[in-house]
Amino acid sequence: MNKSQDKEKKYFLEYLSLAPVLAVISISVAFSTWAIFNYIFPDLLFHPLP
């Protein structure tokens, strides 16, 4: 029983260390995509239509 609790703690700590990493990576990809899109197709606020 003690070994299974140790494994559960190990897996839980791996999950806690992986979730923030995945969150930072996914947010970085999303904002990078947004920035590149706005670089290629600028916002109409700075380039208004005539």
From Swiss-Prot:
Subcellular location: Cellular thylakoid membrane
Membrane-spanning segments: 21-41
Protein name, entry field: PsaJ-like protein asl3190
Primary location recorded for the protein, binned into one broad class: membrane
Domain of life: Bacteria
GO biological process, one term: photosynthesis
Recorded topology in the membrane: Single-pass membrane protein
KW Ligase (keyword) present: no
Record family assignment: Belongs to the PsaJ family.
UniProt-listed InterPro entries: PSI_PsaJ, PSI_PsaJ_sf
